[in-house]
């Protein structure tokens, strides 16, 4: 295949499928605070600034990794005392209970004041950390670790080439599902072998989620239902339980890294675990799994790149469309089955809202992976939502564009109302 095109898809995968510790919105706040703290010569005594409304929505209610606490002020303060900005989305990997205690004391002293503001960028943080006579201000926007401005004691500082390389994402052209399908069928296995890390990391997270009650423990509820004969111990149940176990752990603050997709751990989990479970069921080799995972993650990327990084739409739903593509490919290798499965999913779960990251996200994950599996089964029987059914049409690309049109236009008002409700709580 064209090596330039192959390079594009590998770039997309390496850029958007990345390890992350904890829900990425509170981690982004911790990262910004940690980034500023490294320029202070003593522990910070004050944190101030603002974050975008969408960032607030996804940071206020989810457990901060390695802790049992949540909240925007705590995310900032914990990052300031224990974060390592060199680790990007894994910035909280080395925090300790002492860091949490220091953060709680700072908040108790009313020394953390972070406002919520409407900004053009859905991801926007502007934090200033002070210690003694010194202060450092950091501005992050566009993506979770994209540092665009740095000020020390009010003076702007140049961002080094190393800093820019670490934090900025390359703007890459979008692509169709057919192009992704062609790529994963033709690419050399060694060029995509790295995607197996997604299976390794997210499977480890799922295993952690089964060790104790994280979040709402939805995987435990379903596992008990299987034991008690209320659910079947079939492939669908295994897909749901293993995917939700990782999401439970993720949202419940497990100190275990996830492989994310498009800046979201839950999206990475959703695009990975159903494919892993089906691959294990079919007994395929690593190369086949790598191709299926690449298709799943590329499909999720192709869809999400057509709408905003944060929105009123639950993005686990579009990540699950990637999982549907990966599962359909494992079962059939047929592009028409893949396209049909995605059309079926859009007919099924369009409109599931994102009302912020929280433990209940795992419930949404269980819903979307169930929809994905159902859509694949229907597609394998040549059963497809009709072109006259709502927003779907015969062409999968146009159907995806119709979905994204809803997200970009009318659902922006939905998003504002959701945030308004949450801020008023």
From Swiss-Prot:
It comes from the Bacteria. Pfam families: SDH_alpha (PF03313). GO terms for molecular function: L-cysteine desulfhydrase activity. InterPro entries: Ser_deHydtase-like_asu, UPF0597. One of its GO terms (biological process) is L-cysteine catabolic process to pyruvate. HAMAP family: UPF0597. Belongs to the UPF0597 family. This is UPF0597 protein KPN78578_43500. It comes from Klebsiella pneumoniae subsp. pneumoniae (strain ATCC 700721 / MGH 78578). The lineage of its organism: Bacteria, Pseudomonadati, Pseudomonadota, Gammaproteobacteria, Enterobacterales.
């Amino acid at each position: 295949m064209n090596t330039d095109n192959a390079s594009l898809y590998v770039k997309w995968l390496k850029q958007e499928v990345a390890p992350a510790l904890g829900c990425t919105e509170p981690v982004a706040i911790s990262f910004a605070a940690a980034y500023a703290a490294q320029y202070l010569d003593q522990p910070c005594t004050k944190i101030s600034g603002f974050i975008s409304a969408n960032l607030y929505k996804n940071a206020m209610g989810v457990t901060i990794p390695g802790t049992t606490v949540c909240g925007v002020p705590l995310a900032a303060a914990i990052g300031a005392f224990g974060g390592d900005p060199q680790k990007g989305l894994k910035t909280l990997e080395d925090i300790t209970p002492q860091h949490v205690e220091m953060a709680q004391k700072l908040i108790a002293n009313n020394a953390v004041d972070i406002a919520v503001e409407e900004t053009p960028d859905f991801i926007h943080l502007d934090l200033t950390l002070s210690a003694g006579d010194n202060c450092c201000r950091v501005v992050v926007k566009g993506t979770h670790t994209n540092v665009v401005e740095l000020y020390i004691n009010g003076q702007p500082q140049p961002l080094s080439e190393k800093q820019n390389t670490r934090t900025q994402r390359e703007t890459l052209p979008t692509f169709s599902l057919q192009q992704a399908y062609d790529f994963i069928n033709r690419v050399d296995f060694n060029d995509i072998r790295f995607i197996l890390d997604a299976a390794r990391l997210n499977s480890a997270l799922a295993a952690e989620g089964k060790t104790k009650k994280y979040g709402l423990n939805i995987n435990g509820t379903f596992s008990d239902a299987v034991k008690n004969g209320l659910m079947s111990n079939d492939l669908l149940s295994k897909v749901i339980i293993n995917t939700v176990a990782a999401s439970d752990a993720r949202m419940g603050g497990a100190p275990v890294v996830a492989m994310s997709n498009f800046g979201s751990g839950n999206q990475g989990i959703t695009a990975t675990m159903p494919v892993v479970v089906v691959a294990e069921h079919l007994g395929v080799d690593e190369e086949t799994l790598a191709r299926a995972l690449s298709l799943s993650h590329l499909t999720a990327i192709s869809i999400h790149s057509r709408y905003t990084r944060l929105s009123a739409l639950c993005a686990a739903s579009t990540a699950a469309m990637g999982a549907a593509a990966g599962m359909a490919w494992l079962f059939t290798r047929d592009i028409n089955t893949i396209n049909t499965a995605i059309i079926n999913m859009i007919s099924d779960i369009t409109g599931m809202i994102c009302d912020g990251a929280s433990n209940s996200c795992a419930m949404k994950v269980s819903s979307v992976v169930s929809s994905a599996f159902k859509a694949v089964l229907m597609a394998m029987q040549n059963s497809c939502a009709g072109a006259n059914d709502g927003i779907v049409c015969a062409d999968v690309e146009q159907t995806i564009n119709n979905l994204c049109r809803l997200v970009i236009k009318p659902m922006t008002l939905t998003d504002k109302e959701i945030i308004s409700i949450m801020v008023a709580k």
